[in-house]
Amino acid sequence: MGKLLINSGECIHKLYLYDGRLTCCSDDPRPRELGHPLAGGGTSSPQSSSNDLPTAICNKEIPQTIVVERDAKVDVVILIMPGVNCDIKLDVTLAGEGAEANIYGAYVCGGEEKVKIAVDMHHDLPHCNSRQLFKGIAGGKSRVDFYGKIIVAQDAQRTEAYQENHNILLSDDAKVDTKPQLEIYADDVKCSHGATIGRLNEEEQFYMRSRGITLEDAKVLQMISFISPVLESIVDVSQRETIAAEFESNIRNIINR
């Protein structure tokens, strides 16, 4: 796997989409890569329109290492559809003052998928910001492992770093193991981490059904709303809507199995 360098002053948005049309395994994950520059300039990978989404495949692996230099920003969005096994390891270093990195991820599993995600976020210098937000849905006999770590060096004062991993279980046979971690060696920081594993709220379902919404539609609404904070990080509106529709279709298939 490769290295992605975000040069000083650049703003980059990277979107990696794993779906069942791709052979995706631990030693050769090949997601579609869709990229756009963020507001403020910078460069990114070639753009793909929503019309390209069902068929366009860019055989670029997600980088294993990302280095963000002074006053640069990177947003990475990782989306994993049902039917995909993958092992994602991402090491991010904020290597210049004023650097920022945001890593977002959403995954939906409904069979016997095995999804592993490991993110290490290194704050080496002062005045840097990072956020990790991963939200997932696990059904069937799927297995999800999430390992996230924030490492704040002694010299990295005025750091702000946040990490969240939230999951919904759809079956008793699905398993989620989540391990958020903090290693802080500086004094003047704002850092937090958290993880949750729960079920769909039946009271919400009852409320929606009392207003004429079917149980299937109620569950779909709950799950799409659950992952929507990740989908909202997709800057291209047409891509966001197309991907949300693809997630909805896959979620309906899982419900109706």
Task: Identify what each model region corresponds to.
Residues 30-46, 55:
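Short Gly/Ser/Thr- and charged-rich N-terminal loops/segments
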